[in-house]
Amino acid sequence: MDPDAGVIFARTAAGAAVALGLLKCGRIWLCPVCSGQDPARPSEEITEAVVSWLQQGGWAYLVTFTARHTAADRLSDLMDALQGTRADAETGTKRRPGAYQRLITGAAWAGDKRRKSNQEGIRGRIGYIGMIRATEVTVGEGAGWHPHIHAIVLVGGRTEGQRGDKRITGTFTPSEDALTEWEDRWRRSGPATLARSTPGFRPPTGARSPGATAGARATASTSSSSVRSGRQRPGRVHRQDAGRQEPGPGAGTRRPQGRPPGQHDVLRTPSRIGDLMGGVPEEEAAGHGSLAWGLDRWAEYETAVSGAGHRVDPLPAPAPGPDRRRHRGRRHGRPVPDRRRRRFRDGVQIWDRAWKGLVGRSLDLAVVEAVEGREISMDALGELVQSAGQSRAFLRVLTPQEVTELYDELLRTLARRREQAAERRAAEAAEAEPTTR
């Protein structure tokens, strides 16, 4: 937290409270600040990105990246194999790509300019421009952990330029042959890349057992609410895994098929823990597993996914033209709203001293509840600050412009402090080096 600016709580157009100026831990189920804003953050971005692309004439497919697992596998190992390892400067750990990253690299995918038969690769033949992805984790006493990635893959785009200079020039309908080639490659490559990442991995039996499964196709007629909830237009399922039941006409939401008995979304675990700790008998509480089992699983999950969330991969910008209007809120031309341009209704500034008092009395969540909604409850905030032994004078209502200006100043201050810290660490390292003669 910046001691000069304190903490800023901004209220979005949807009424959600967003904390600015706080170093967040990313533990969305143990931290009231992170839990309050994480669910609301990606929904607007995902909806706008997908609907904008469909309205331009592009195509979107729902794809699931999954991996075989056993009860003996640790969640962190499975997620590293699927998503890759994170870089850690303190431990010297380097970033290592996982099975997901390897699916979108290589000559077969990206093309080979030296070969006339594969100049553009699968990526060019389907018009791939990017994807939006999020990780879901299920767990069971028998089958153990099962992390998998749900992705919305955006295809059907014509582009020009290379890498950072790539621009979207139009849209087209990918051929059935190109889509089949893409699907087959991801099915074949998934198990193989997982095996390379995790020596103990054993590919599933069966020629059609997937490392990636194609799901429903979203169409230009898909509404914003449908995209947000994952529902598709009835009867418009385009491609589906052969090992799963085909939804018939009128199918709405697509439930995961083939989940083993006793396997549930790990996010249901806290509810069962609360019931069991409150005295509800095991057979009556929702979910499964003993209290000790649930606590152990939740601790492992919370550690393994700290800071994880939805990812929007970089998308090419539209090509400039006299009749092309930039979509409001785009960042570098991407059909994703810039968070710094988010339309804030208003906000409130809480000075350093008052915020420390609120945190000391565990009133973080109460502050979020007072900010979010149709309007900021300054009376409730004032009472909270006074209950923490501080003055109401440490609160200030902010206009949308003031929120943006303060946030920009916070970012500049953070960048400046990071530079100073890097210089300080470099100087300390130089002093610690032994003198050589």
From Swiss-Prot:
| Alphabetized UniProt keyword annotations | Antibiotic resistance, Plasmid
Could you confirm whether the keyword Cytoplasm appears in this record? Answer: no
Instruction: Specify the protein name.
Output: Neomycin resistance protein
Its GO biological process terms?
response to antibiotic
Q: Which organism is it from?
A: Streptomyces cyanogenus
Q: Which spans does this entry mark as compositional bias, Low complexity?
A: 203-229
Q: Where is the composition biased (Basic residues)?
A: 324-338
Family listed: Belongs to the Gram-positive plasmids replication protein type 1 family.
Q: Which cysteines are joined by disulfide bonds?
A: none
What residue spans carry the region label Disordered? 161-285, 305-338
